[in-house]
Amino acid sequence: MVMFKKIKSFEVVFNDPEKVYGSGEKVAGRVIVEVCEVTRVKAVRILACGVAKVLWMQGSQQCKQTSEYLRYEDTLLLEDQPTGENEMVIMRPGNKYEYKFGFELPQGPLGTSFKGKYGCVDYWVKAFLDRPSQPTQGTKKNFEVVDLVDVNTPDLMAPVSAKKEKKVSCMFIPDGRVSVSARIDRKGFCEGDEISIHADFENTCSRIVVPKAAIVARHTYLANGQTKVLTQELSSVRGNHIISGTCASWRGKSLRVQKIRPSILGCNILRVEYSLLIYVSVPGSKKVILDLPLVIGSRSGLSSRTSSMASRTSSEMSWVDLNIPDTPEAPPCYMDIIPEDHRLESPTTPLLDDMDGSQDSPIFMYAPEFKFMPPPTYTEVDPCILNNNVQ
């Protein structure tokens, strides 16, 4: 019977554990081994991998696909470590043995580290400890990679605009139309940027409508000729009600890009895309939706912002740092300060549900309930009787 020797410690440690790597950069670290008793080691090996994987069940069929970005193998050696017979390393208790490693990530596009419901992009280093007459022992450590997406390219700095009109009917009788046109100054943004929205809304139907905007993520998984798409709302902002026969405009309505992963556009089995949806909720009818594509980058484009955007950011930073605005501003609209940002708990939740979780779009206009003033306070003690008793 073979007795298995226990290893006290066997781990992969990176030189910079918090670092996020990019293409062409060097990943360096060491494999640390400590033993409980004298142990002979044939070799310490590492395998570094970067793989995109998608997997889901469609009926009884398993849809599965992989795409490899990185594969690196090496056998590590100790520095100035005596070896025994057959070139084996003799490890003794109380000592710490460190095997250094280093490799460069491939040049060119790499998939950004990502974990989704039906797929992921993972990078890791796995170490193997080979011992005679003992099973190979392994340990694994993940590291993070971000594919650099430069939002300062001419294509991503160009404005994006769209417009749409919808005819509304009630019981097959025409009931006017709802139209929306919108524009944003650029297509590429980074985490923390403010999207300045310029939009015009017109409502000629008999219903009250509500304009809103939302940043939406779309995760697309492809395998075996099948496609799975999940959509998730990340943050949103809304405007005031637009009554029948009126128009409304947004001039620089602001929506902040939350902490999200950069777009993944170069992978052939997994994509992460973002959009700005500007839409109008019409009671009893489908929404009027504009879809403006966004690219979320990993390299800031602050140097190329417009002066209005720069002044807006500067004003907000002054408010945060000094708690005193540089110049007095008009108070915000009440509806603008109501927190509307929310994240769907499940990616399978329908996007932009017709009910919107609130009753802020009544079909008919109504007057608020009239409330009478409360009666004055009174007492059951007659003041006249009280005065007579005193006299």
Curated annotation (Swiss-Prot):
Phosphoserine modifications at: S361
Superkingdom in the source lineage: Eukaryota
Pfam families: Arrestin_C, Arrestin_N
UniProt cross-link Glycyl lysine isopeptide (Lys-Gly) (interchain with G-Cter in ubiquitin), position: K212
InterPro entries: Arrestin-like_C (IPR014752), Arrestin-like_N (IPR011021), Arrestin_C-like (IPR011022), Arrestin_domain-protein (IPR050357), Ig_E-set (IPR014756)
GO aspect biological process, one term: cellular response to tumor cell
Post-translational modification, as annotated: Ubiquitinated; undergoes heterotypic 'Lys-48'-/'Lys-63'-branched polyubiquitination catalyzed by ITCH and UBR5 resulting in proteasomal degradation. Deubiquitinated by USP5, leading to TXNIP stabilization.
Principal cellular location given in the protein's record: cytoplasm
Keywords: Cell cycle, Cytoplasm, Disulfide bond, Isopeptide bond, Phosphoprotein, Transcription, Transcription regulation, Tumor suppressor, Ubl conjugation
Subcellular location: Cytoplasm
GO molecular function: ubiquitin protein ligase binding
Any one GO CC term of the record: cytoplasm
Subunit structure and binding partners: Homodimer; disulfide-linked. Interacts with TXN/thioredoxin through its redox-active site. Interacts with transcriptional repressors ZBTB16, ZBTB32 and HDAC1. Interacts with DDIT4.
Function: May act as an oxidative stress mediator by inhibiting thioredoxin activity or by limiting its bioavailability. Interacts with COPS5 and restores COPS5-induced suppression of CDKN1B stability, blocking the COPS5-mediated translocation of CDKN1B from the nucleus to the cytoplasm. Functions as a transcriptional repressor, possibly by acting as a bridge molecule between transcription factors and corepressor complexes, and over-expression will induce G0/G1 cell cycle arrest. Required for the maturation of natural killer cells. Acts as a suppressor of tumor cell growth.
Protein family (similarity comment): Belongs to the arrestin family.
Protein name from the UniProt record: Thioredoxin-interacting protein
Taxonomic path: Eukaryota, Metazoa, Chordata, Craniata, Vertebrata
